[in-house]
From Swiss-Prot:
GO terms for cellular component: plasma membrane. InterPro entries: NqrB/RnfD, RnfD_bac. This is Ion-translocating oxidoreductase complex subunit D. GO terms for biological process: electron transport chain; transmembrane transport.
Length: 358
């Protein structure tokens, strides 16, 4: 007697835990690059996020009457926490990452039934809730630490996150007071605010000469483009390992680049398309967030449509919206469209005629 089982009858051989660990490994170049340019805050934020995520997931699974260890061992909750920790400002107050992680795990994942059931990317749910609820804390970034006279030590980072002061009693803003033209905003924030209030091209050229953009006089938005390149390298690694598919990141980046380039021909509007690609969370979102296998499209054509849709939304938000980045909102808006995309891009079943043929 043979036991009848439903399709599919093939298996990729990749366990969920192995996939999650490969993704975490691919994020390490960007993780250490962020430490190099912005200090140890991301280490502490990651530890807080992962610890909070494990506790929240353990309790949620226990309340559902299941065995927590069977679910925690897939490392998916650790990856969600790490993504969120790397997305927020490194020196945000400790309660910000705790609230965001709880929202990501409980509202973004467990409320739908756990891994594989959630329609939205959990980390982006947590991030957007934080951005809307605590805009000041979520937009206060320290400039690259090489611009500071006294870069914060690990002890300073710990003290800043938990008390708002360094071990010497300085606030985050006081650490940057000696740098001309420095604000506690990202280059994308600064460029967008400046563009809306200044229309002269010469004025904008003066902006990008400030230290946060030029650093030692050669780097545009130093720290940010290096982190984006590190995410790009990690993303290419995942594609080569066949952990993620190329369609989503390529479609997203190409769509955004084409739209941004076309906009540039209409006159001075914003940063160049290349500058946009290596700023903010563009590469992070393209390779590590939009490619989430649970919340992204699963059909070959659907992946291209989904990626292009994310790129379109990022363009609309960055160029015409109020938020300077827009990657998180773009991914969540595209997640809404996934069921419709998959419905209309399902591959033809073998043996059935193509549409329009008998």
């Amino acid at each position: 007697m043979f036991k009848m089982v439903s399709s599919p009858h093939t298996h990729s051989g990749k366990l969920t835990a192995h996939i999650m660990l490969w993704v975490i490994l691919a994020m390490m170049p960007a993780f250490f690059t962020q430490i190099y340019y912005f200090g140890f805050g991301v280490v502490l934020q990651s530890a807080l996020a992962i610890g909070t995520a494990i506790i929240a997931e353990f309790i949620a699974i226990k309340l559902r009457g299941k065995k927590p260890l069977n679910y925690l061992s897939d490392f998916s909750v650790a990856l969600t926490a790490l993504i969120l920790a790397m997305a927020i400002p490194p020196y945000a107050p400790y309660w910000v990452i705790i609230i965001g992680t709880l929202c990501a795990v409980l509202l973004g994942k467990q409320v739908y039934g756990g891994l594989g059931q959630n329609p939205f990317n959990p980390a982006m749910i947590g991030y957007v809730i934080l951005l809307i609820s605590f805009p000041l804390q979520m937009t206060t970034w320290m400039p690259p630490i090489n611009l500071l006279q006294e870069p914060p030590t690990f002890s300073d980072a710990f003290s800043l996150i938990f008390s708002g002061l360094t071990t010497d009693g300085f606030t985050l803003s006081q650490l940057t007071h000696n740098i001309d033209g420095i604000t506690q905003a990202t280059p994308l924030d600064s460029a967008k605010i400046f563009y809306k209030s200044h229309t002269q091209l010469s004025d904008f050229y003066e902006l990008i000469k400030l230290p946060i953009f030029m650093g030692n006089g050669t780097d545009f938005a130093q720290g940010w483009w290096q982190i984006n390149v590190a995410f790009l390298a990690g993303g290419i690694f995942l594609i080569l390992k066949r952990i993620i598919h190329w369609q989503i990141p390529v479609a997203m980046l190409v769509t955004f680049f084409c739209l941004a380039t076309a906009t540039a021909f209409t006159g001075f509007t914003h940063l160049s398309a290349i500058s946009q690609l290596v700023s903010g969370a563009m590469m992070f979102g393209a390779f590590f967030i939009a490619t989430d296998p649970v919340t992204a499209s699963i059909t070959p054509r659907g992946k291209i449509i989904f990626g292009a849709l994310v790129g379109l939304f990022v363009y609309l938000i960055r160029y015409h919206g109020n938020y300077p980045d827009g990657v998180a909102f773009a991914i969540l808006l595209s997640n809404i469209c996934v069921p419709l995309i998959d419905h209309y891009t399902r591959p033809r079943v073998s043996g059935y005629p193509t549409k329009g043929r008998k």
